[in-house]
Each structure stands twice: as structure tokens, then as C-alpha cells.
């Protein structure tokens, strides 16, 4: 998790996101600059060379809510994927209860009168809120891997 401070999420750009429901895995691909804390920050000779293509790989996703602005698909512009921030912390019992996790059941209300309950086991979970100019991800998961997709510095 400490790798999150290696990147400046206020300046990055969302490239794509893919959710595999069977594997319960979410991959968010972003182009984001490295910070001074990154071990390779000294390799860059200008700001553009600080950017890296990064995959945020959320494993064992238990909850995913993605809010997408109509502008993302109907009138996208060059700023649509601008990243604004990311927070990541242990998911508190209060948050889990608010999201429908409680008493070993996950309660889902589909809004049309349909209610579903699924069994779950109490486990240590993490929560992330990741926001761009046109979309917000709320994710409850067990493990996060942060992987740069190229060995050398990416030039824009």
C-alpha cells in the first residue's frame, strides 16, 4: 500500500478500467507522474519523463460502485480522465454496515422492491475512493497491487 505515495494522483489521467466479476478483480490503468518518494524519480530529466503507466490491481473485490458522468461517454473532452485524488484505508465496521455488510449477510436493494442477501465472512477489508474529473470509484477489497507496466520511463 505504501506505493500509493510514489505517484501524484492529482495530475494523472485515467486510461481505462476493467472489472472481472468472476475473478473479483478490478484493474484501473492510469498515466500518472512519479513523486520524489519513487525510487526512480531521479531518472527523469523533465516533468513529462516522470509519468509512468500504472495498473492499480484490486483483488478480491467485495464491493464496487462506479459513478460515471454523462460527459464521459456523450461529450468526452481531453480532461475527462483527469485524476483528482485517491484515498485508501482499512474499511471500518461503520462503513461496511453502511454499504450493506452486516450480520454475515450483504444486503442489496435493487430499488425496484427486490432485495437480496448474500452470505459473507468477516475479514479485514480495505476501502478506496478514486476520483477523476468524470467518474468516481468506491471499492471494498482485500488486496491492492500497484504495477508499472513498462521498464523504462514513458515519454508523452
Give the location of each predicted region.
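Surface-exposed, interaction-prone regions used to assemble/regulate multi-protein complexes
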Residues: 1-156
